[in-house]
């Protein structure tokens, strides 16, 4: 049924459906048609022209409209009214399920079973040369890729609306922030982007006449014929997620899943931004940002890089078990860092949390539970009989539920899926709703970083925590990061893979050059190099070799390790403070330097947590050498030197 949707003085014809605003015309405030014909369809660009003088933006949107042939174009303003309109429409169409009033303004979506995670095998870095993309990225000649994608995008939005979303990665007005514009045919993507980025009119107003922006084209690749019923989760089995680093542009086809479709997230803020950062002398990293305040009121900011689903969100939102210590969060996934007088300052370019649901509970992450108590989009979790959400690890299982595939589910029942919620099921929630949000989280200047932590999921070999001997050694530690695979990426769960800096899926250029860029920060800092962050490595996941049980309780107890890191940031790179012992791999906590007051942990577990097995480390080093061979002459000599030095220290010990 056609109805008028009045929004901020604009009268737009619309139809309630999953694709929203399915009218073939737009009307201006006087009720007259305005716009230009494209083929047999009518598109209005007058609203965009009224809002911006940036001709590059206007031309780009018009080009995408001519290519994708949507039924209409809608310029998103980012308002709450707009969000409500889209979610109401998607509830009516079956794309969303509205949750009960105890979780206000929150919704559940179920994806197509084939569209549940990032698709690394279909993700491309189309640099001008294969060498610039590097051996860890999929590559195709950019012109060839565009020829491949053009027929796929041609008419891909028929029967749908093209939504135009101006968005800012980072606080508006920050010299660290950058602006993008995404067009999409998915209202679900629009609603997620409203939460995850600063999106809408306030951003469009920032794009001046000659400003650059990162253009992001997205289509689910499921055009609708006239009268055709839409899917609750339209997607296409032929998926491409493509980045052009020299052009600073993105194209994504076929997927509606977060990391593939929310192009401000991994695509822009890591793959494209890392390339921009290399050129601009800054860092775009797969890192959380947190602050730790000690019992004397002193605060330090820490950035930490872990692969997906290895505890970034839980650490960023940890509740301290130590009296007088407080953890606050600036971001749980991405950090953009720039140097000022040797000091790295970081912003979180995102505006929301896109967290893994399974395992999130009142005991593991109470702040996350509070953050997702309202205004949240859930994907692929289970639905309880009272219209709330559930996932493994949240609480005791409900007596019955509807699983992520839409089937009836009973705990331990016959014919069940293994999981009620998909292992990579997600929540999208505003950062501002987290009770432990740091007051500086939205500061356009950024926050000063005192420590950088690397870590991964290792069941053996790597101790609970150790510290780099110097900056070069710290870069090597980041480069040697390895982790057991998780459900957030394609592949066999549990398989160990090298994941340097937790950036393997996200580095937008040759990773050998990326290592060199990190090494260059020391020279860039010059005489202020002592202000560079101290570098550490942690492993919460080490297991007892006999029982297979975790040796460290993790979660809030990890603050004990953060306290040691905090104290080491106040010390020089030696052992004079009595809190560290030098070993072949770096500085490890000396006896009794980790605050264990109130923690029940036996001496044998503690000993195993910090044990160093020479043969295991030499095996890891051999694996690292093999991994680095692929970079050829793009591997910095300093990384080779660090491998040699580590081997010498291990053999001397």
Curated annotation (Swiss-Prot):
Q: Name one GO biological process term.
A: oxaloacetate metabolic process
What is a GO molecular function of this protein? GTP binding
**Recorded superkingdom:** Eukaryota
Where in the cell? Mitochondrion
Fetch the InterPro entries from UniProt: PEP_carboxykin_GTP_CS, PEP_carboxykinase_C, PEP_carboxykinase_GTP, PEP_carboxykinase_GTP_C, PEP_carboxykinase_GTP_N, PEP_carboxykinase_N
Location, primary (coarse class): mitochondrion
Keywords assigned by UniProt, alphabetized:
Decarboxylase, Gluconeogenesis, GTP-binding, Lyase, Manganese, Metal-binding, Mitochondrion, Nucleotide-binding, Transit peptide
Known catalytic reactions: oxaloacetate + GTP = phosphoenolpyruvate + GDP + CO2
Q: Which GO terms describe its cellular component?
A: cytosol; mitochondrion
Task: Give the cofactor binding note.
Answer: Binds 1 Mn(2+) ion per subunit.
Cite the binding residues for Mn(2+).
Answer: 266, 286, 310, 333
Has keyword rRNA processing?
A: no
Q: Which Pfam families match?
A: PEPCK_GTP (PF00821), PEPCK_N (PF17297)
Q: Which residues bind phosphoenolpyruvate?
A: 118, 259, 424, 426
Give EC number(s), comma-separated. Answer: 4.1.1.32
Q: Where does GDP bind?
A: 309-314, 358, 457, 540, 550, 555, 558
What pathway does the annotation place this protein in?
Answer: Carbohydrate biosynthesis; gluconeogenesis
**Transit peptide as recorded in UniProt:** 1-51
User: Which PROSITE patterns is this protein grouped with?
Assistant: PEPCK_GTP
Q: What is noted besides the main data?
A: In eukaryotes there are two isozymes: a cytoplasmic one and a mitochondrial one.
Please describe the quaternary structure of this protein.
Answer: Monomer.
Family under the similarity heading: Belongs to the phosphoenolpyruvate carboxykinase [GTP] family.
Q: Which PANTHER family match?
A: PHOSPHOENOLPYRUVATE CARBOXYKINASE, PHOSPHOENOLPYRUVATE CARBOXYKINASE [GTP]-RELATED
Q: What is this protein called?
A: Phosphoenolpyruvate carboxykinase [GTP], mitochondrial
Which species is the source of this protein? Dictyostelium discoideum
């Amino acid at each position: 049924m056609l109805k008028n949707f009045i929004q901020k003085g604009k009268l737009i014809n619309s139809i309630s459906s999953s694709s929203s605003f399915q009218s073939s015309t737009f009307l201006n405030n006087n009720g007259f048609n305005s716009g230009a014909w494209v083929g047999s369809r009518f598109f209005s660009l007058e609203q965009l022209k009224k809002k911006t003088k940036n001709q590059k933006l206007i031309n780009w949107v018009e080009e995408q409209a001519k290519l994708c042939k949507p039924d209409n174009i809608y310029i998103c303003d980012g308002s709450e009214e707009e969000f409500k309109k889209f979610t109401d429409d998607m509830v009516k169409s079956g794309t969303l399920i509205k949750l009960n009033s105890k979780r206000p303004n929150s919704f559940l979506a179920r994806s197509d079973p084939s569209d549940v995670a990032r698709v690394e095998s279909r993700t491309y870095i189309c640099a001008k040369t294969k060498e610039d993309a590097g051996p860890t990225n999929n590559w195709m000649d950019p012109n060839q890729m565009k020829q491949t994608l053009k027929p796929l995008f041609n008419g891909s939005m028929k029967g749908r609306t093209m939504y135009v979303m101006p968005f800012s990665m980072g606080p508006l007005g920050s010299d660290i922030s950058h602006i993008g514009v995404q067009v999409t045919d998915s209202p679900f993507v629009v609603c997620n982007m409203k939460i995850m980025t600063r999106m809408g009119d306030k951003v469009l107003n920032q794009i001046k006449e000659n400003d650059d922006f990162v253009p992001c084209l997205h289509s689910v690749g499921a055009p609708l014929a006239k009268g055709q019923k839409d899917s609750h989760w339209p997607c296409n089995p032929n998926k491409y997620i493509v980045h052009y680093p020299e052009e600073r542009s993105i194209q994504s086809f076929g997927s509606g899943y977060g990391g593939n479709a929310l192009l401000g997230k991994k695509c822009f803020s890591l793959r494209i931004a890392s390339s921009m950062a290399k050129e601009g002398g800054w860092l775009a990293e797969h890192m959380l940002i947190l602050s730790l305040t000690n019992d004397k009121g002193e605060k330090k900011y820490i950035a930490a890089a872990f692969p997906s689903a290895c505890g970034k969100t839980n650490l960023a939102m940890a509740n301290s078990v130590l009296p007088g210590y407080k953890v606050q969060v600036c971001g749980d996934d991405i950090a953009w860092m720039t140097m000022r007088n040797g000091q790295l300052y970081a912003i979180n370019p995102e505006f929301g949390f896109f967290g893994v649901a399974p395992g999130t509970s009142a005991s593991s992450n109470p702040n996350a539970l509070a953050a997702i108590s309202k205004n949240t989009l859930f994907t692929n979790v289970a639905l309880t009989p009272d219209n709330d959400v559930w996932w493994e690890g949240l609480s005791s299982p409900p007596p019955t539920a509807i699983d992520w595939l839409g089937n009836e589910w009973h705990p331990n029942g016959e014919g069940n899926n293994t999981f009620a919620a998909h292992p990579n099921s997600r929540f999208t929630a505003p950062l501002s709703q987290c009770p432990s949000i740091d007051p500086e989280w939205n500061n356009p200047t950024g926050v000063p970083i005192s420590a950088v932590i690397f870590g991964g999921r290792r069941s053996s070999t790597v101790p609970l925590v150790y510290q780099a001997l110097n900056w070069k050694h710290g870069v090597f530690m980041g480069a040697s990061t390895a982790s057991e695979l998780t459900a957030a990426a394609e592949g066999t769960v549990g398989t160990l893979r090298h994941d340097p800096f937790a950036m393997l899926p996200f580095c937008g250029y040759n990773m050998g050059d990326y290592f060199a860029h990190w090494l260059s920060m020391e020279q860039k800092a010059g005489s202020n190099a002592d202000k560079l962050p101290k570098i550490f490595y942690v492993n919460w996941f080490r297991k007892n070799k006999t029982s297979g049980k975790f040796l460290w309780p993790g979660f809030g107890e990890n603050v004990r390790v953060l306290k040691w890191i905090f104290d080491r940031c106040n010390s020089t790179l030696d052992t004079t403070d009595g809190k560290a012992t030098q070993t072949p791999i770096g500085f490890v906590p000396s006896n009794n330097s980790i605050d264990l007051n109130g923690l029940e942990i036996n001496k044998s577990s503690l000993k195993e947590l910090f044990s160093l097995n020479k043969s295991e480390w030499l095996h890891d080093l051999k694996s690292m050498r093999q991994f680095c061979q692929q970079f050829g002459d793009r591997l910095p000599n300093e990384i080779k030197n660090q491998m040699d030095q580590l081997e010498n220290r291990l053999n001397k010990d």
